[in-house]
């Protein structure tokens, strides 16, 4: 197997569902190694969470700027290569932009940004810097979805004529507001 991609995470600490999903998904195929990140706006909480994950405390940062500054001082073979952005929606753009401008590949939770113009700007930076920028669609990583995909590909369930999907959530009506996001902010 080739060397694992060194991963950092912004947000997604504690009992954050999206944080759990990203950590599990990144470990499913043994392609990523979580190196560090910023898991909570309160550094002490972030440090404690990093300790629970078995991370070196020197790689659990107080904020994005300190992470970028510290990681960029490291030898290229040791620094974080890609960062998952799991923060409240309104922070996706400024954080992803800063990461791209500092030569980190980005894996961003939905929504990519809160405006079309921001999305175009990120796309242009990504192209100029020749970096990878991915927006997650986490259902593709679920074991049941993978099994269903294999069953369809192998003809186990016959020809598919129609697919109906239902996504249930206990999220409040205001959970889709772009100025919110993150249930503890």
Placement of each model-derived feature along the sequence:
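N-terminal Rossmann-like dinucleotide-binding module
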Residues: 1-55
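Nucleotide donor/acceptor-binding cores
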Residues: 3-5, 131, 161
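Conserved acidic residues
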Residues: 35, 58, 81
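A structured beta-alpha segment of the ubiquitous adenosine-cofactor-binding alpha/beta core
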Residues: 61-80
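Beta-strand-loop-alpha-helix segment that lines the small-molecule cofactor/substrate pocket
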Residues: 82, 88-140, 155
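Oxidoreductase and adenylate-handling cofactor-binding alpha/beta cores
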Residues: 141-164
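Conserved small/polar residues in nucleotide/adenosyl-binding loops
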Residues: 167-172
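Hydrophobic alpha-helical segments, chiefly the membrane-spanning helices
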Residues: 179-185
């Amino acid at each position: 197997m080739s060397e694992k991609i060194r991963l950092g995470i912004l947000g997604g600490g504690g009992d954050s569902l999206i944080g759990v999903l990203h950590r599990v998904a990144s470990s499913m195929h043994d392609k990523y190694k979580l190196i560090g990140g910023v898991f909570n706006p309160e550094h002490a909480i972030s440090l404690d969470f990093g300790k629970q994950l078995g991370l070196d405390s020197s790689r659990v940062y107080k904020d994005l700027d300190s992470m970028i500054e510290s990681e960029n001082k490291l030898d290229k073979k040791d620094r974080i290569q890609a960062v998952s952005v799991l923060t409240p929606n309104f922070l996706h753009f400024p954080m992803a932009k800063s990461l791209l401008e500092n030569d980190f590949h980005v894996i961003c939770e939905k929504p990519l940004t809160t405006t079309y113009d921001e999305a175009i700007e990120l796309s242009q930076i990504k192209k100029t810097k020749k970096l990878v920028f991915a927006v997650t669609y986490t259902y593709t990583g679920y074991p049941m979805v993978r099994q269903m995909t294999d069953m369809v590909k192998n003809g186990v369930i016959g020809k598919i004529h129609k697919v109906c999907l239902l996504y249930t959530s206990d999220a409040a009506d205001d959970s889709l507001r772009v100025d919110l996001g993150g249930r503890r902010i």
